[in-house]
């Protein structure tokens, strides 16, 4: 149990998708203007990561990995070259289902997210979750914990940035730095803050 808690903490703070690896920056900056919308997208990312990382783990372990098809009497077949295509297919399917559910049950959030909801499909943070899982050779329970943790790390970062950007609206920001300029500086300072977690050994 301690191993899984360590993995979760590590994925949220030490290896934060947005502030340590700078993944998913396009959506991260575009949707972080309002806290409510940022939290909505953050929850969507957590849900997508929590489903796609374990799903891709099963896909890799029982279909794509070298020797994975031994159960079908094909031990010499290696389909790992289909990894990228397969992971994107799984991610696209999950995002499409999530989009339909939000459209039906939470139309206000669906409209607020707009084009950025289908763009989760090509959000590199989502893809990175599956690629890191394969690279680090996580088993299924580890991939579940890592999927939730990596999604939560991105959601936490965008919610924090949105809160800061809302406060900055009432601040006396120099004209040349208003908008994206101060947002990039804020992200850099947040990243420096999260670097302090890198000294923690888990």
Curated annotation (Swiss-Prot):
Entry GO terms, CC: Gram-negative-bacterium-type cell wall; plasma membrane
Example of a GO biological process term: respiratory electron transport chain
HAMAP family: NqrE
Subunit structure: Composed of six subunits; NqrA, NqrB, NqrC, NqrD, NqrE and NqrF.
Reported function: NQR complex catalyzes the reduction of ubiquinone-1 to ubiquinol by two successive reactions, coupled with the transport of Na(+) ions from the cytoplasm to the periplasm. NqrA to NqrE are probably involved in the second step, the conversion of ubisemiquinone to ubiquinol.
PANTHER family hit by this protein: INTEGRAL MEMBRANE PROTEIN OF SOXR-REDUCING COMPLEX, NA(+)-TRANSLOCATING NADH-QUINONE REDUCTASE SUBUNIT E
The protein, known as: Na(+)-translocating NADH-quinone reductase subunit E
Gene Ontology MF term list: oxidoreductase activity, acting on NAD(P)H, quinone or similar compound as acceptor
Gene that produces this protein: nqrE
Similarity annotation: Belongs to the NqrDE/RnfAE family.
Location, primary (coarse class): membrane
InterPro entries in UniProt: NqrDE/RnfAE, NqrDE/RnfAE_oxidrdctase, NqrE
Transmembrane segment boundaries: 11-31, 35-55, 81-101, 114-134, 144-164, 180-200
Catalysed transformations (reactions): a ubiquinone + n Na(+)(in) + NADH + H(+) = a ubiquinol + n Na(+)(out) + NAD(+)
Cell compartment(s), UniProt: Cell inner membrane
Enzyme Commission number: 7.2.1.1
Catalytic class of the enzyme: translocase
NCBIfam families: nqrE
Taxonomic superkingdom: Bacteria
Membrane topology reported for the UniProt record: Multi-pass membrane protein
């Amino acid at each position: 149990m301690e191993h899984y808690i360590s993995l979760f903490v590590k994925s949220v703070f030490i290896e934060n998708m947005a502030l340590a690896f700078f993944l998913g920056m396009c959506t991260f900056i575009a949707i972080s203007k309002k806290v409510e919308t940022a939290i909505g997208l953050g929850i969507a990312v957590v849900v997508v990561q929590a489903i796609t990382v374990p799903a891709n783990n099963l896909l890799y372990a029982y279909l794509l990995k070298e020797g994975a098809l031994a159960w079908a009497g094909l031990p010499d077949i290696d389909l790992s070259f289909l990894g990228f295509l397969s992971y994107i297919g799984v991610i696209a399917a999950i995002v499409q289902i999530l989009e339909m559910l939000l459209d039906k049950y939470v139309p206000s959030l669906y409209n607020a997210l707009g084009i950025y909801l289908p763009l989760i499909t090509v959000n590199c943070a989502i893809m990175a979750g599956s690629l890191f899982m394969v690279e680090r050779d996580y088993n299924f329970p580890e991939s579940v914990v890592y999927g939730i943790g990596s999604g939560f790390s991105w959601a936490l970062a965008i919610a924090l940035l949105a809160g800061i950007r809302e406060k900055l609206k009432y601040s006396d920001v120099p004209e040349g730095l208003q908008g994206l300029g101060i947002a990039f500086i804020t992200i850099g300072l947040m990243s420096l803050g999260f670097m302090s977690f890198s000294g923690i050994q888990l």
